[in-house]
Amino acid sequence: MPAKESPFRVNLKILPSAQRNELTGYENGLLKIKIAAQPEKGKANKALVDYLSELLDTPKSEIEICRGLSGRNKVVAFYSLSQADFEAKISAILRGS
C-alpha cells in the first residue's frame, strides 16, 4: 500500500456513552464530540470514525485516529480533507446550517 499524503490533524475531546452522536463545539482548543458507543473493545473509536465520515462526507479509509486510542483526548488525521474544508464544514454544522 503506498504511503498517504501528509494529513490535516485535529485534536478532539470525545465523550463516550452519550445518548446520541453529537458535535458540541470547542472546549479548551479541542473539538468536543459526544459518541453514543461504549468505550470498550474499540467500539467508541469505530463509532467516532463512522460519525466523522458521515458528518464530513469523507471516506472512513481517509480518517485515522493517530493518538489517544484508549483515552478521551484524541488526535485524528484526515487524508482527503484540507484544514479549510474541515473548518468550513464544522462551522456550518455548529451554526445549524
Swiss-Prot record:
NCBIfam families: DUF167 family protein. InterPro entries: DUF167, YggU-like_sf. GO terms for cellular component: cytoplasm. This is UPF0235 protein DET1292. Belongs to the UPF0235 family. Gene3D superfamilies: YggU-like. The lineage of its organism: Bacteria, Bacillati, Chloroflexota, Dehalococcoidia, Dehalococcoidales. It comes from the Bacteria. It holds the Pfam family DUF167.
